[in-house]
């Protein structure tokens, strides 16, 4: 038998029997001695084995290739060249040949991505390339790969008007960006620099220049740091695909710059119009997903927008909040979304206005402002009580006007006697009793049970949510400082089962202010401090941790949002690696001992003993939960453990004091089922017994529902994928039915699949549908009827555009629409709407955009603002503005639109040096705008607890100086990872540690932005 045949048979057997990479390397050494093979032939055999299997993704294959590279049997350049030869990237859409070839060639992009990522790791750790020839070969292979991917992109664009090129395939985007990062990594090595600096490699540099020139225009939509790194590489080594141009001449560049300045100076701004749609868009954006409410940032935006015209500001803000509620009703938004909008109107706005009034140096006629705002509302949407009986339509908002007026009266904005005048009829309720935060804190300290009652009232729409939230968060912080974990447990349990209450909390507090004390307590939990029973301690620890997990997964929070600055934090380790199982030989001696004790307690002994728990801290148990599941399930699948015994042992985890551990365990189990190549019957039976237990205690039911809320979305996606591969299975649907009610738990601002399908089937695709939305907003503002309902709008559409097609293309569409509306004499209105869309808060960039408003509270050395994982509309606009001198020469009208929009956005987003006629120091002192845990000023909510400088308010001018300095320093931001899944079935996942921070694709949540400066 020939060497290639023997190696082919060997590889086929290894894949079929799921031989791990360590054993594969040992077996390969033996076969190399018996049947030596050239590296080109070897990699061909490896990749052809994939074709024989016909599997879209096998995680073992790239691990085998990486193992052969580490053994020195394969070079990266050879691997990349062969990988391209066998890749499905060559398939062209819409051709008969491609269809015929599809039968012979399997989909390879997932494997291609992983192999290239392994090459990135080898380069970044210094293991490759080992010679100048290998380096040159690697450069050539990367250039060929880039040309192939760009060609595929253009083929997709040409094949269908609805195709989005790269953006039509997350795998293609990941592959594209991986190639760029690999190129940057190789060019940063010593041998890479030698190759690029050598005059004897002109042919290579020309080819590489062609590839870079094709790559960079597409890269700008994906990763600005990567684009900047490769752009610098191109300029440094003159990689333009041709001999370097002759001296351009400094004078011509200077002339271009001067012409750009003169062009901008020639543009005269029109009147700044504050359209009704502008604030309508901004409020929608604040509440589209996680409530993005920062009082200082909002007040700054409103002050920039309205100046000293506070009566107009208040009137328009009230109108916008009612418009948002009206839109939600007509769009049939969920009751959860409708509740948040109502709570913002009734609970947030009155307290916000009260803060403004307390600091105002001028009289603001609140009753008149409210009257004018209410007169602009559609009476059919907000009917009076008497009209309800004659109306046939939806009366869900019939009592909102009354609730808002009573809340305003409760905050002393208007006298109670004016409610009847403003309503036009007798009110049907009495004025609610107003709360004081300090009184509520005293009540909870005296009677801890009062906290439960108040948490229930957070969801009331009586205007009292602000003081309640302030009291609850202050008490929680004090309890954390005092380590009074029993009372804290009860508060955390009460909050965990009320997701809507968490939404209201974020109207008044940032996530960091709520969660930083909890995470610090969990991280510093010393097991030897408590000498009592272990079960209550597990109970308290689990309840506190569960609330942190609820916040994290409901709102997709980053480590920065959670207030975690220590890389060795237990909470951070749990989120990043908790759902990844470990091999036994990777565990420490104490971990092996704890694991054995828990396995014995669950499956051998009569139950969990005090000795088992007292020997293992809660932190250690949670970090071992996935490994415990992995080992137990493996024993059952191997026939060493009866399923009923397995099921009985897992039922112990349904006890309240251990239930929160199912968050990490179910995440691991879902990944295991999704990855399984063998029959997943046993894991599915285990999963069904855990998500739908035959019996569970009353106390545990609420915790179990919370656990399902957290894990349902990922489990649902994984199980549906498994069902697609095994359509005949009948044991998946019952699990999906149990999970279905929990799928609406996340609140991240992501759109629904049905919404995306509607937008993408628009004649102009997603960008066309966004332009159509902008047109409807302009049309609404030009209507002479002030009572006309707002047009249908959800900010999820704009967020989807940024995440899917990228901010650069989306901004281009907005600029095109702005020019069109300008030609139709609606330019000033359209400019305000476009600027509002650009300024609207976005979850990914909220941390960096809000940080300048709290410079005193931010210690960038200890707690740096994270990097933003994507290019925002503001970033894209800034890049367009930099290019105005060149754009003005080719397309003056477009350059003018860029300049006007840039100016309007800059005016709306600029930190104000002083709010006219508002004494901000008085505002802070009277309205208790204390700097909280992370410095997010929240009106009406003093930040309590350690670290707050009571009575030591910062000077406003100093704050603004610091903010300007921070802005000049160019602070970046980003978003943290979720709980890391073991996506390779317990195999070597070292590459994931490098790539967890890498944003490998727009719209692909598996990867985040790579710190380019740190890597290169």
Swiss-Prot record:
GO biological process entries: regulation of transcription by RNA polymerase II
Main location: nucleus
InterPro entries in UniProt: Mediator_Med5_fun (IPR014801)
Keywords of this entry: Activator, Nucleus, Transcription, Transcription regulation
Disulphide-bridged cysteine pairs: none
Subcellular localization(s) per the UniProt record: Nucleus
Gene Ontology cellular-component terms listed: mediator complex
One MF term in the entry's GO annotations: transcription coregulator activity
Summary of the function given for this chain in its UniProt record: Component of the Mediator complex, a coactivator involved in the regulated transcription of nearly all RNA polymerase II-dependent genes. Mediator functions as a bridge to convey information from gene-specific regulatory proteins to the basal RNA polymerase II transcription machinery. Mediator is recruited to promoters by direct interactions with regulatory proteins and serves as a scaffold for the assembly of a functional preinitiation complex with RNA polymerase II and the general transcription factors.
Quaternary assembly: Component of the Mediator complex.
UniProt record similarity statement: Belongs to the Mediator complex subunit 5 family.
Entry protein name: Mediator of RNA polymerase II transcription subunit 5
Organism in which the protein naturally occurs: Aspergillus terreus (strain NIH 2624 / FGSC A1156)
């Amino acid at each position: 038998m020939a060497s290639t045949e023997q190696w082919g048979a060997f590889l086929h057997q290894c894949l079929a029997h799921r031989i791990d990479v360590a054993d594969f390397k040992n077996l390969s050494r033996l076969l190399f001695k018996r049947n030596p093979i050239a590296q080109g032939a070897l990699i061909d055999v490896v990749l052809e084995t994939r074709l024989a299997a016909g599997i879209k993704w096998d995680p073992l294959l790239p691990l085998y290739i990486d193992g052969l590279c580490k053994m020195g049997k394969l070079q990266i350049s050879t691997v990349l060249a062969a990988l391209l030869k066998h890749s499905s990237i060559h398939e062209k859409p819409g051709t008969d040949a491609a269809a015929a070839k599809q039968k012979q060639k399997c989909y390879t992009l997932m494997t291609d991505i992983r192999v290239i990522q392994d090459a990135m790791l080898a380069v970044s750790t210094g293991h490759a390339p080992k010679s100048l020839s290998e380096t040159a070969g690697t450069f050539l292979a990367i250039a060929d790969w880039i040309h192939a991917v760009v060609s595929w992109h253009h083929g997709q664009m040409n094949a269908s008007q609805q195709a989005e090129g790269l953006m039509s395939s997350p795998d293609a985007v990941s592959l594209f960006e991986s190639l760029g990062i690999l190129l940057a990594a190789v060019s940063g090595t010593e041998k890479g620099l030698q190759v690029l600096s050598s005059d004897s490699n002109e042919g290579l540099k020309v080819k590489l220049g062609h590839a870079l020139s094709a790559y960079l225009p597409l890269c700008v939509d994906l990763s600005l740091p990567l684009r900047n790194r490769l752009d610098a590489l191109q300029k440094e080594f003159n990689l333009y695909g041709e001999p370097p141009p002759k001296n351009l001449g400094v004078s011509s560049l200077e002339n271009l710059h001067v012409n750009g300045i003169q062009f901008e100076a020639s543009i005269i701004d029109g009147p700044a119009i504050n359209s009704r749609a502008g604030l309508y868009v901004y409020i929608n954006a604040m509440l589209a997903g996680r409530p993005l409410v920062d009082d200082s940032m909002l007040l700054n935006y409103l002050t920039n927008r309205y100046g000293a015209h506070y009566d107009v500001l208040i009137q328009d803000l009230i109108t916008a909040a009612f418009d948002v509620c009206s839109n939600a009703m007509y769009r049939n938004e969920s009751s959860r979304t409708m509740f948040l909008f109502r709570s913002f109107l009734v609970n947030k706005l009155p307290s916000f206005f009260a803060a403004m009034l307390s600091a105002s140096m001028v009289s603001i006629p609140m009753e008149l402002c409210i009257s004018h705002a209410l007169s602009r509302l559609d009476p059919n949407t907000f009917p009076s009580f008497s009209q309800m009986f004659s109306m046939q339509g939806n009366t869900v908002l019939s009592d909102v006007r009354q609730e808002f007026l009573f809340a305003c009266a409760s905050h002393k904005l208007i006298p109670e006697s004016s409610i009847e005048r403003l309503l036009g009829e007798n009110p049907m309720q009495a004025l609610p009793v107003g709360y004081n935060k300090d009184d509520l804190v005293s009540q909870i300290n005296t009677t801890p049970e009062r906290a439960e009652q108040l948490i229930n009232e957070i969801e009331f729409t009586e205007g009292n949510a602000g003081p309640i939230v302030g009291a609850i968060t202050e008490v929680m912080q004090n309890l954390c400082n005092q380590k009074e974990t029993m009372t804290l447990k009860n508060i955390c349990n009460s909050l965990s089962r009320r997701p809507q209450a968490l939404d209201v909390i974020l109207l008044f507090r940032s996530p960091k202010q709520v969660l930083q004390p909890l995470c610090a307590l969990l991280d510093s939990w010393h097991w030897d401090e408590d000498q009592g029973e272990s079960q209550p301690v597990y109970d308290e620890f689990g309840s506190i941790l569960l609330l942190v997990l609820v916040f994290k997964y409901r709102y997709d929070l980053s480590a920065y949002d959670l207030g975690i600055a220590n890389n060795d934090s237990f909470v951070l380790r749990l989120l990043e690696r908790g759902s990844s199982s470990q091999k036994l030989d990777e565990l420490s001696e104490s971990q092996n001992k704890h694991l054995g004790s828990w396995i014995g307690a669950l499956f051998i002994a009569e139950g969990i003993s005090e000795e088992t728990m007292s020997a293992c801290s809660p932190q250690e148990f949670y970090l071992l939960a996935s490994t415990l599941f992995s080992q137990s399930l493996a024993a059952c699948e191997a026939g060493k453990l009866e399923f009923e015994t397995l099921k009985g042992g897992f039922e112990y985890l349904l006890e309240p004091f251990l239930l929160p551990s199912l968050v990490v365990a179910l995440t691991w189990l879902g990944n295991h089922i999704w990855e399984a190549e063998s029959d997943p019957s046993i894991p599915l039976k285990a999963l069904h017994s855990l998500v739908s237990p035959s019996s569970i205690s009353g106390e545990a039911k609420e915790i179990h529902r919370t656990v399902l809320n957290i894990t349902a979305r990922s489990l649902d996606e994984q199980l549906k994928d498994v069902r697609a591969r095994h359509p005949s299975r009948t044991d998946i649907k019952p699990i999906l039915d149990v999970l279905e009610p929990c799928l609406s738990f996340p609140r991240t601002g992501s759109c629904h699949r049905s919404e995306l399908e509607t937008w993408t089937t628009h004649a102009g695709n997603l960008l066309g549908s966004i332009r159509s939305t902008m047109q409807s907003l302009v049309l609404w503002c030009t209507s002479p009827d002030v009572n006309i309902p707002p047009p249908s709008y959800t900010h999820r559409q704009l967020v989807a555009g940024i995440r899917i097609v990228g901010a650069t293309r989306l901004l281009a569409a907005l600029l095109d629409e702005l020019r069109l509306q300008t030609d139709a004499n609606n330019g000033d209105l359209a400019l305000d709407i476009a600027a509002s869309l650009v300024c609207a808060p976005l979850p990914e960039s909220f941390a960096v955009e809000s940080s300048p408003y709290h410079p005193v509270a931010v210690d960038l050395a200890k707690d740096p603002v994270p990097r933003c994982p994507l290019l925002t509309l503001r970033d894209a606009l800034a890049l367009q503005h930099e290019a105005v001198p060149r754009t003005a020469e080719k397309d003056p009208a477009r350059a003018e639109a860029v300049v006007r929009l840039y100016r309007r956005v800059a005016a709306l987003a600029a930190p104000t040096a002083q709010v006219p006629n508002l004494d901000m120091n008085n505002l802070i002192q009277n309205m208790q705008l204390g700097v909280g845990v992370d410095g997010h000023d929240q009106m009406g909510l003093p930040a309590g607890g350690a670290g707050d400088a009571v009575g030591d308010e910062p000077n406003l001018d100093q704050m603004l100086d610091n903010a300007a300095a921070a802005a000049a320093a160019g602070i970046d931001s980003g978003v943290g990872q979720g709980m890391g899944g073991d996506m390779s079935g317990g195999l070597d996942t070292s590459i994931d540690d490098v790539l967890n921070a890498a944003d490998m694709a727009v719209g692909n949540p598996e990867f985040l932005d790579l710190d380019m400066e740190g890597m290169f």
